[in-house]
């Protein structure tokens, strides 16, 4: 894999150490397992509306080409493959891809896993109906370049989902102090506050890449029961749904 300005070596090393714990629902990635049910429902709803699909069918995403960027252990990729999507999933951490590939095989799911960057796929001219940019933005070294690479991967009638963390005092308090040090929901060092991006910054990059935001939502966590819910407030975690058309 050639040098890419969006890759941070410390991030790669951090997730390499945790790779074997992706599918441990009580391990360090338990928040992602909690979040996955919520975000999958959000994604399915938006895709069915955009592509005029029957949300009540068993495989509402059948034939849609979906790219999961920064797929980790494949938690979201497996969910969407189960709904019929043709999923390609990429990550720069080789151990993540090995873990994800093995787990998908055990579940009899056909997912195209690759150790690859968004930039390399875009340079190769690949296009997808759906690009998933979920919980990745806050881990890349070059935000603008990464976002434009992802935008290049969206087909003419395609869409992109972005989920990340806002940058303000509240997000520092909740996403870093609270989640990593007080509640210890996440390993210390998971996030860097200066790499968080505001909704305005993310929207600007989407616009530069030819995409328009059509839906916004926040995600809130209950510290007492560890449950997550969709909310209107985007003060901390937020999701954007953007369309090329």
How does the language model describe each region?
Residues 3, 27-31, 134, 190-193:
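Conserved short-loop catalytic and cofactor-binding motifs
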Residues 34-62:
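Conserved alpha-helix/loop element of class I SAM-dependent methyltransferases that forms part
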């Amino acid at each position: 894999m050639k040098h890419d300005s969006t890759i941070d070596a410390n991030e790669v090393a951090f997730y390499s150490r945790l790779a074997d714990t992706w599918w441990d629902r009580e391990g360090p990635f338990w928040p992602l397992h909690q979040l996955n049910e919520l975000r999958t429902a959000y994604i399915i709803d938006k895709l069915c509306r955009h592509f005029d699909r029957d949300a009540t069918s068993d495989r509402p995403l059948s034939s849609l080409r979906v790219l999961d960027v920064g797929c980790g252990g494949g938690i979201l990729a497996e969910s969407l493959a189960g709904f019929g999507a043709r999923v390609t999933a990429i990550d720069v951490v080789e151990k993540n891809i090995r873990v994800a590939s093995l787990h998908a095989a055990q579940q009899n799911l056909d997912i195209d896993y690759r150790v690859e960057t968004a930039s390399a796929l875009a340079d190769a001219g690949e296009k997808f109906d759906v690009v998933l940019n979920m919980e990745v933005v806050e881990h890349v070294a070059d935000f603008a370049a990464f976002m434009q690479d992802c935008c290049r991967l969206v087909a003419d009638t395609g869409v992109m989902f972005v989920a990340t963390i806002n940058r303000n005092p509240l997000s520092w308090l909740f996403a870093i102090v609270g989640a990593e040090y007080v509640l210890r929901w996440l390993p210390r060092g998971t996030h860097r506050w200066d790499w968080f991006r505001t909704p305005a910054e993310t929207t600007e990059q989407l616009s530069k890449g030819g995409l328009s935001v059509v839906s916004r939502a926040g995600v809130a966590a209950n510290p007492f029961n560890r449950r997550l819910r969709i909310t209107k407030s985007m003060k901390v975690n937020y999701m954007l749904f953007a369309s090329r058309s």
